[in-house]
A protein has these predicted regions:
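Outer-membrane beta-barrel biogenesis signature
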Residues: 19-146, 354-358
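Residues that define the transmembrane beta-barrel architecture of outer-membrane proteins
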Residues: 104, 116-118, 165-170, 231-236, ...
């Protein structure tokens, strides 16, 4: 899984002792968004040499905003299991279901087939997501930095982060056949987030433009570790699907549908997105021993506090096109091999770039480096592609 969004915990997301984000009071909150990557000890290292803790908080929050926004966006597009996979219909001659199709189908891509009027399908699955890279760089070593100016003094600060972020998802699915060709499904995820962050190599340099000199230097040997977890119900999704072609057992099948996502997950613990969401989609399938399938959809999202924790108002969570396609091969009546490619487009997502900031004045000597790590907020549109097989 490409972790384009998952640097929320390795940047300067919050200071739990002296700072707060908009309507989120991190002085008292125990939410993950307030605890990582800066514990009280971590921010204490920076604050001890800062000439303005308020300016320090503002600079750190400015870096956190696009990171948290990227996380929330990613959480809206995690794949969920098919709502009809595993249904095997034993057909009697003259029944309303037409030609029996006992290919068990794909795992993460839905297909046009419906369960039939009055029938119920229930399923359960487990998924594990291990986020290990961001913008092409391993989360095992991410340098982050920022700067701020008070009067004649500019502070340049940076750290290195080693991050381990994992999400375990237990998904329950229930589908009811409202009519012969229409299904209603409910998807309920139970999420468990596990996170550990080690922050080290603290660097802090204060440049005084009036005297053209540098002041406080933080020890690069300082290291602070933080561990946290959260679990609970994620965002519940309700899905409506209608088959428009294929009810009579034809080889080709087409269905259309829509889904609504509800912000039931705790977004401040990254168990959910914090926003309502809507999705419209089309499904295509050719029924054969080797059955290709395709899903095309578009995701809309509402407003989420996680998009900007500094603001009292919520900001729209980005959406975009989605696609999923693959094929499933029937080996026998009870065994099917399936493979899928899943893609997501993220439109105008608040993001960031990692780079270097050149230090002014008499840098490059007397222990002062010529440059330091920096993190620059930006907006971008990008796509991700992942594969799955079973």
């Amino acid at each position: 899984m490409k972790a384009k969004a998952l640097l929320l915990f390795i940047s300067f997301a919050c200071a739990q002792t002296v700072y707060s984000f908009g309507q989120v009071d991190c002085n008292t909150s125990t939410k993950l968004v307030c605890q990582f990557p800066f514990s009280a000890q971590t921010l204490g290292v920076f604050a001890s040499g800062s000439n303005s803790t308020g300016a320090l908080a503002t600079a750190a929050e400015g870096v956190a905003t696009p990171i948290n926004a990227s996380i929330a966006t990613q959480l809206t597009q995690l794949p969920i299991p098919s709502a009809t996979v595993g249904v095997v219909t034993l057909q009697k001659k003259g029944s309303e279901f037409g030609t029996a199709f006992d290919n068990l189908g794909p795992v993460l891509t839905d297909r046009p087939d419906t369960v039939g009027k009055g029938h119920i399908f229930a399923g359960f699955s487990y998924q594990h997501f291990n986020f290990n890279a961001l913008a092409g760089q391993s989360l095992a070593n991410i340098p982050i930095g920022f700067s701020y100016t008070i009067g004649n003094v500019t502070s340049f600060e940076a750290v290195s982060n080693k991050v381990d972020f994992q999400l375990d998802q237990y998904v329950g699915v229930a589908t009811y056949g409202a009519t012969r060709s229409t299904d209603i499904s409910v998807v309920v995820p139970i999420n468990s987030v596990s996170l550990s962050v080690t922050t080290s190599n603290f660097q802090g340099y204060q440049y005084n433009a009036g005297t053209n000199s540098y002041g406080q230097i933080f020890s690069p040997q300082t290291s602070v570790s933080s561990v946290g977890s959260a679990s609970g119900v994620g965002d519940v999704t309700v899905i409506l699907k209608h088959m428009v072609l294929g009810q009579e057992g034809s080889r080709g099948a087409i269905a259309v549908g829509a889904s609504a996502r509800f912000p039931s997950g705790d977004s401040l613990n990254y168990l959910g997105s914090g926003a309502f969401g809507g999705n419209v989609y089309g499904l295509f399938e050719y029924r054969a021993r080797l059955a290709p399938h395709l899903k095309l959809s578009y995701q809309w999202n509402g407003n989420s506090q996680v998009m900007d924790l500094q603001s009292s108002s919520k900001t729209t969570l980005p959406g975009g096109l989605q696609y999923a396609g693959g094929a499933d091969l029937k080996l026998n009546r009870s065994l099917t091999l399936a493979t899928d490619i899943l893609g997501n487009q993220f439109v105008n997502v608040p993001s960031f770039t990692l780079g270097k900031t050149n230090l002014p004045g008499p840098s490059g000597k007397d222990g002062i480096p010529s440059s330091i790590a920096s993190t620059t907020p930006t907006n971008e549109t990008y796509t991700t592609a992942n594969s799955a097989g079973a």
